[in-house]
Amino acid sequence: MSDKCGNCDCADKSQCVKKGTSYGVVIVDAEKSHFEMAEEVGYEENDGKCKCTTGCSCAGCNCGK
């Protein structure tokens, strides 16, 4: 996967955004409860700098390295 961005999820690959693992956390208190959303992005795969070009090729990063 060194030549492709694993975070591409869009019709126009030049406008790809990061897609990571999302999970929810429910915090319960004696008086109230609320839901928080957290997102974990695989920075170890692309250093958080991965840009997708047309065809979903990786530009300006070390995806998968």
From Swiss-Prot:
Function field: Metallothioneins have a high content of cysteine residues that bind various heavy metals.
Designated name of the protein: Metallothionein-like protein 3B
Any GO molecular function: zinc ion binding
UniProt cross-references to InterPro entries, sorted A to Z: MT3
Gene Ontology process terms (BP): intracellular copper ion homeostasis
Species per Swiss-Prot/TrEMBL record: Oryza sativa subsp. japonica
Family (UniProt): Belongs to the metallothionein superfamily. Type 15 family.
Keywords from the named record: Metal-binding, Metal-thiolate cluster
Expression by tissue: Expressed in leaves and rachis.
